[in-house]
C-alpha cells in the first residue's frame, strides 16, 4: 500500500517535473508573518520546494511526508529539520504544538475521511492564534491526478470553511498562485 497516494511510485518524476517556484511566493508572505524561530509543521513537505522559503524566513520547520523517496531528498536539503515519514492522517505531529501548519498540494489527494482527520489533527496541533495555510480548489470536484492517475477531490470552499469554523478557525481564502492553486488561510481562535 502506497501511503503517499501514488507519490512514492512517481517520486522521481514529481521531483523532475514540479515547477520549482509555484507556491513559494504565497508561502513566503505567509511565513514572514511569524516571528523568526516560530515553529511550523509542513504536511506533505515532499522534497522541500515550499519548505525552502519557510527555512529562509527563519522558521523552525518540522516536515511530514509519506513518500520515503521524497523525504530522503528533503533530508539531504535540510539535514537539521526534524522529519517523520508518515501519512498526514496518521502522523503523531511530533507530539507537540506549532505556531503554524502548512499543507500545499496535499489535502485534496486524500480521501474525504482522511481530509477531515487531517483538519481535526491540525486544529489540535496549533497553538491559540496559530495559522494554517493549505491549498484546494474552490469548487467541490473530483479529478484524476495527472501524475499518479489516482482520484483527487476538493470538498469545496463552503465545506472547508464550515469544517474549519467548526474546529474554531477564522478563515479567509481567495488567493491564487501562478499555478492556479487556490489557498485557504485560517487562524485558530
What are these regions (language model features)?
Residues 1-34, 46-93, 110-117, 121, ...:
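Class I (Rossmann-like) S-adenosyl-L-methionine-dependent methyltransferase catalytic domain
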Residues 39, 130-131:
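Short glycine-centered segments of the SAM/dcSAM-binding site in methyltransferase folds
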Residues 42:
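Class I SAM-dependent methyltransferase core
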Residues 102:
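A conserved beta-strand element that flanks and buttresses the S-adenosyl-L-methionine
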Residues 105-109:
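Short catalytic micro-motifs in class I SAM-dependent methyltransferases
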Amino acid at each position: 500500500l502506497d501511503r503517499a497516494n501514488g507519490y512514492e511510485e512517481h517520486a522521481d518524476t514529481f521531483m523532475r517535473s514540479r515547477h520549482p517556484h509555484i507556491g513559494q511566493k504565497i508561502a513566503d508572505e505567509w511565513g514572514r508573518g511569524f516571528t523568526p524561530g516560530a515553529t511550523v509543521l509542513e504536511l506533505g513537505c515532499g522534497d522541500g520546494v515550499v519548505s525552502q522559503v519557510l527555512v529562509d524566513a527563519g522558521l523552525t520547520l518540522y516536515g511530514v511526508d509519506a513518500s520515503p523517496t521524497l523525504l530522503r531528498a528533503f533530508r539531504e536539503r535540510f539535514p537539521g529539520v526534524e522529519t517523520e515519514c508518515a501519512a498526514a492522517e496518521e502522523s503523531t505531529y511530533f507530539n507537540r504544538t506549532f505556531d503554524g501548519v502548512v499543507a500545499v498540494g496535499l489535502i485534496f489527494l486524500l480521501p474525504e475521511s482522511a481530509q477531515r482527520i487531517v483538519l481535526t489533527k491540525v486544529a489540535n496541533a496549533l497553538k491559540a492564534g496559530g495559522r494554517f495555510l493549505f491549498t484546494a480548489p474552490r469548487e467541490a470536484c473530483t479529478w484524476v491526478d495527472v501524475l499518479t492517475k489516482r482520484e483527487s477531490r476538493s470538498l469545496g470552499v463552503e465545506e472547508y470553511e464550515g469544517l474549519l469554523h467548526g474546529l474554531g478557525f477564522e478563515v479567509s481564502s481567495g488567493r491564487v498562485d501562478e499555478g492556479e492553486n487556490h489557498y485557504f488561510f485560517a487562524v485558530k481562535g
